[in-house]
UniProtKB/Swiss-Prot annotation:
Cellular localisation: Secreted
Organism ancestry: Eukaryota, Metazoa, Chordata, Craniata, Vertebrata
Entries under SUPFAM superfamilies matching the protein: BPTI-like
Tissue specificity: Expressed by the venom gland.
Disulphide bonds in the chain: 31-81, 40-64, 56-77
Domain of life: Eukaryota
Function: Serine protease inhibitor.
Pfam families assigned: Kunitz_BPTI
Region forming the signal peptide: 1-24
PANTHER family named among the record's database cross-references: KUNITZ-TYPE PROTEASE INHIBITOR-RELATED, SERINE PEPTIDASE INHIBITOR, KUNITZ TYPE, 3
Protein name listed in UniProt: Kunitz-type serine protease inhibitor nigrescinin-6
Length: 83
């Protein structure tokens, strides 16, 4: 196979990896943690994975503490936790 063909194959495999949803067996354990706004009084838009609804949802993060099920963007949440 030519080097151009190998690069195309590598590019397609990389794209497939990025676009393929995370399966529940690959999902990190922290995706099962509940929404936790933390103990501070900030008002920051954040996203968490709701394991009952199997989707990423918005919540208000206080800015400190909380847990690892806390993402700045819905895209980051989906790439990490959504199946």
């Amino acid at each position: 196979m030519s080097s151009g063909g190998l690069l195309l194959l590598l590019g397609l495999l990389t794209l497939w990896e990025v676009l393929t949803p995370v399966s529940s067996t690959d999902r990190p354990d922290f995706c099962e943690l509940p929404e936790d706004s933390g103990s501070c009084k900030g008002n920051f838009e954040a996203f968490y994975y709701n394991s009952d609804q199997h989707q990423c949802l918005e919540f208000i993060y206080g800015g400190c503490d909380g847990n690892a099920n806390n993402f700045k963007t819905i895209e980051e949440c989906k790439l990490t936790c959504a199946a």
